[in-house]
């Protein structure tokens, strides 16, 4: 019993330490000289607090014990902003604080183990922004009740007080988590080139994406510089010329039983072969489970897979596929060579990375079998474990 009540007191104390609502999260900042957003590797925390003047503050600080400095401090007026999930990022759980009245948008990657906690915290943040005074009173009342020893400290129960415990209450947002991100060793999200990316928003030439720079004004107020362009509903962030050409290639792929000589499937080829937006186009006659749940070693020894790969390469060699070969910088002779399949898969990988369809983070961690796994392998393994 003591451990149960001790846990409740610890959770309540943690909430008090970091304000009304808090969530472990890191920041995303622009890589100098590029239009690539990269994850700040530091452990951090987002939290919100109502000041004595009843102004709502959105904070971010490093979560180190020795760190007390607040790096991000934004004053938010009622309904002035929203905290939304960025579904275009498929290698991590990324949220953005987007201001409705300006071009400000600040990106954060979540460091909690539970994606459900992300959703609940985001809902509370949006409740605070919409109605800071009443929501603050409700949260404080709930925390006071928890501190007296009642075991009702979960955020989901707190959400029920606002009638927002279900997904229906969040229908304006898509909270689907494609690849859960755990705390360090973490899978850090990375956004490719902004001009072609499916995972980043275009910025104007005047925009500065180096991260938020807040300076204190004479009256103690914080003034933030606009750091990124607002979301534009007219822009198709998922556009990919390569996917368009693969769509045109699909009818040319016949369900034949020819066979190519097996070869070892490397990491880059495996990411192309198993990507959910790619494999239905290049392997239309292959059972989806064959690709979705197969590791590199399994595919390298699967004769049925290489039959489907042979059908793909015969389609790539057809005259109608000249445009696809051109953007992959491959000649017909290269495609028809003994190593043509490997060359084509590697060329596809490079194209899809440049267009933002495949997102890489260059973060590695050791798998259960001792083999070093890159982010893509971890993402696929976690997906498979969920399915099982």
UniProtKB/Swiss-Prot annotation:
Domain Pru span(s) in chain numbering: 15-132
PROSITE patterns with a match to the protein in the record: PRU
Biased composition (Basic and acidic residues): 378-388
Gene3D superfamilies cross-referenced by the UniProt entry: Proteasomal ubiquitin receptor Rpn13/ADRM1
Acidic residues bias (residue ranges): 368-377
Chain segments carrying region Disordered: 202-227, 368-388
UniProt keyword annotations, A-Z: Cytoplasm, Nucleus
Pfam families membership: Rpn13_ADRM1_Pru (PF04683)
The organism's place on the tree of life at top rank: Eukaryota
GO biological process annotation, one example: proteasome-mediated ubiquitin-dependent protein catabolic process
Localization, UniProt: Cytoplasm; Nucleus
GO CC terms: cytosol; nucleus; proteasome regulatory particle, lid subcomplex
Predominant location category: cytoplasm
Listed GO MF terms: endopeptidase activator activity; proteasome binding
Family per record: Belongs to the ADRM1 family.
Domain-related comment: The Pru (pleckstrin-like receptor for ubiquitin) domain mediates interactions with rpn2 and ubiquitin.
Subunit structure as annotated in this protein's UniProt entry: Component of the 19S proteasome regulatory particle complex. The 2 S.pombe rpn13 homologs, rpn1301 and rpn1302 are present at a 0.2-1 ratio.
Cited function: Component of the 26S proteasome, a multiprotein complex involved in the ATP-dependent degradation of ubiquitinated proteins. This complex plays a key role in the maintenance of protein homeostasis by removing misfolded or damaged proteins, which could impair cellular functions, and by removing proteins whose functions are no longer required. Therefore, the proteasome participates in numerous cellular processes, including cell cycle progression, apoptosis, or DNA damage repair. Within the complex, functions as a proteasomal ubiquitin receptor.
Record protein name field: Proteasomal ubiquitin receptor ADRM1 homolog rpn1302
Species assigned in the record: Schizosaccharomyces pombe (strain 972 / ATCC 24843)
Gene field: rpn1302
């Amino acid at each position: 019993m003591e451990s149960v009540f001790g846990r409740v007191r610890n959770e309540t104390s943690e909430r008090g330490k970091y304000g009304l609502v808090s969530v472990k999260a890191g920041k995303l900042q622009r890589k100098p000289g590029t239009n690539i957003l990269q994850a700040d590797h530091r452990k951090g925390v987002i939290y919100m607090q109502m000041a004595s003047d009843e102004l709502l503050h959105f904070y971010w600080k490093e979560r180190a014990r020795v760190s007390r400095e607040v790096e991000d401090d934004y004053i938010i007026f009622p309904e002035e902003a929203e905290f939304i999930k960025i579904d275009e990022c498929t290698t991590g759980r990324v949220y953005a604080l987007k201001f409705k009245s300006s071009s400000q948008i600040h990106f954060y990657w979540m460091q909690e183990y539970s994606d459900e906690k992300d959703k609940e915290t985001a809902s509370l943040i949006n409740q605070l922004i919409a109605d800071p005074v009443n929501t603050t009173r409700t949260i404080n009342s709930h925390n006071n009740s928890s501190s007296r020893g009642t075991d009702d400290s979960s955020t989901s129960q707190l959400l029920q007080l606002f009638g927002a415990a279900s997904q229906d209450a969040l229908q304006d947002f898509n909270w689907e988590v494609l690849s859960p991100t755990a705390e360090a060793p973490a899978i850090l999200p990375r956004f490719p080139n902004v001009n072609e990316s499916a995972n980043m928003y275009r910025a104007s030439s005047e925009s500065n994406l180096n991260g938020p720079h807040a300076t204190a004004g004479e009256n103690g107020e914080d003034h933030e510089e606009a750091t990124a362009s607002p979301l534009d509903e007219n822009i198709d962030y998922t556009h990919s010329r390569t996917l368009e050409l693969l769509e045109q290639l699909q009818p040319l792929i016949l369900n034949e039983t020819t066979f190519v000589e097996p070869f070892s499937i490397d990491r880059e080829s495996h990411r192309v072969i198993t990507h959910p937006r790619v494999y239905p186009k290049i392997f239309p006659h292959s059972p989806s489970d064959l690709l979705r749940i197969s590791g590199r070693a399994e595919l390298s020894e699967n004769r049925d897979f290489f039959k489907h790969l042979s059908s793909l390469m015969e389609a790539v060699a057809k005259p109608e596929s000249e445009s696809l070969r051109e953007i992959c910088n491959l000649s017909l002779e290269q495609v028809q060579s003994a190593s043509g399949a490997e060359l084509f898969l590697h060329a596809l990988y490079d194209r899809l990375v440049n267009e933002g369809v495949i997102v890489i983070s260059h973060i590695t961690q050791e798998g259960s079998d001792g083999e070093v796994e890159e982010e893509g392998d971890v993402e696929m393994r976690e997906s498979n474990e969920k399915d099982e």
